[in-house]
């Protein structure tokens, strides 16, 4: 599946209403529900085998979604970033003049005050060759 970042809406597909039923309809594939835990406000939807995982608030409004490199494409400013090497992403963001912060635990980077996070788990070991495994969009 293909998704695109929107500074205004987080993900262009979710412009407007982001209630659980609409998110499920828009993604349009099989999903399973993981029960609420002590760390989440509500249950979590997992789409496909590894397309996306969505978090909702107590009112079933989307508050965050993570897209995975195995079965998704995620575009930022017109370029696919999932599955790319960190050096590609770093150079691309630099070209755009986008400043990023390295996560405290060294597992990725974030931009736009943490609203968009790139999970790069091997960043410390593999450096510029580490792969972007997922992208998390925060709607809070």
Model feature map: region roles:
Residues 1-140:
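Short helix/turn-capping signatures at newly exposed starts of structured segments
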């Amino acid at each position: 599946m293909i998704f695109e970042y929107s500074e205004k809406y987080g993900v262009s597909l979710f412009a407007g209403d982001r209630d659980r039923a609409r998110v499920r309809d828009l993604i349009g594939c099989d999903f399973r529900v993981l029960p609420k835990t002590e760390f989440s406000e509500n249950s979590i939807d997992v789409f496909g085998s590894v397309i996306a995982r969505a978090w909702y608030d107590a009112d079933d409004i989307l508050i965050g979604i993570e897209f995975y490199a195995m079965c998704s494409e995620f575009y930022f400013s017109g370029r696919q970033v999932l599955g790319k090497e960190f050096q590609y992403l770093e150079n691309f963001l630099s070209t755009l003049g986008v400043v990023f912060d390295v996560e405290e635990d060294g597992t990725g980077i974030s931009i736009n005050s943490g609203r968009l996070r790139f999970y790069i788990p091997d960043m410390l070991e593999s450096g510029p060759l580490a792969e972007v495994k997922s992208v998390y969009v925060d709607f809070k």
